[in-house]
Amino acid sequence: MLELYPNYYPKFTCTADQCPITCCQEWKISVDDDTYRNWFTIQPPTDVAPQKATLSAYTTYQAETRVIRLNEQKKCPFLKENRLCRLVLAYGDAILSETCTTFPREFHTFSNHVEKTLMPSCPAVIDLWKEETKLSFPSVDASLCSDTDNLLFSVRSHLISLMQNNPASPEHILLECFYILLESQQQTLSSDLLADYFSESVIGQLSDAIEQMDFPLEDTLSECNELLQDLAVNYQKEGLYSRFLTPLLALADQISAGTVTYDLTEEWDTFEQQFFQYQALIRNFLTNEFFSDLLSPDGDLESIIVQMQWIGMEYAVVRHSIFLKWLSDGKGELRYDVVRDSLVVLTRMTGYEKDDIYEYLENSFEHIIWDWGYFALICG
């Protein structure tokens, strides 16, 4: 089957023991059925503690998924002190589960092609994007798809192009993208409609209209603060990402209580000047999210809208966490590792499956599809 992937995809190399945020710690490591059956017959390396009869004994069933049971330090029991894998050292790569073998690669199998991307929840991927001025994404050959699917792929391509090529800020373009998606849902989708919505004149008018709108910064900061707290609550209870989350949530609680001793809006203005230097990286991150997450093999226009909401919320909490970290670090120069680590941890925390995204939105909001104003509130 035809394989399509972005220009950066073949450049990825795992940094193994040099990785600053290992994928062998603080999140679910799935074990596929074939690996699980194989592990029933294999003894653990002698330096794994505690010793058990077979590798399968180190797994557990969690949220309908078989995973490796983490130790008290929330690490994989097979992770050595030097951050290398005991299983690989003892048995080679073939012993690993599919998750360990493929991460951070992501595959989506459509009717006539497979799309491959890399996920932002790996520091080495963010490092790759930092070095790329502009990511390049493949187009889907119209002859491979039905007319309906072609229109959906065209929607995605237009959104990617808008984010990559429009000189406005990434936040401004997110607002344009979401507005166009909502408007498209009200009419019969066609190539002519898309050509009109994404024409230079219509985009210009939409951009001017957004520029004239007032988005109270205090409300944006307050809502993003609540979103971060809500997304983090379960991770905090389980003691996951505590080194990253604990100082941020302490500051977030102070903001919610109104006990911070400085003007957040004034600090935000200074922060934005620091954050601007990473605009190319943020644009690469968002365009990759568009390519990898907006359209699934069973997707439609509504699911694209829902995924755009999730991407918008994801970005809002990433940006807010970077802001809080910058505040807690003394409001000086915004370091690259702060931006990278926030992208990695928050995308791990928001890396929900499609059904889980719908469940979260149903439980947290009155309607699955947001008003444009709410999207503008958190992303503006």
Question: Where are the regions that the model predicts?
Answer:
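Detector for Asparagine
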Residues: 7, 38, 71, 82, ...
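Generic alpha-helical secondary structure signal
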Residues: 34-37, 150-153, 157, 337
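Conserved aromatic-histidine-acidic binding/catalytic patches
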Residues: 88-92, 110, 147, 151, ...
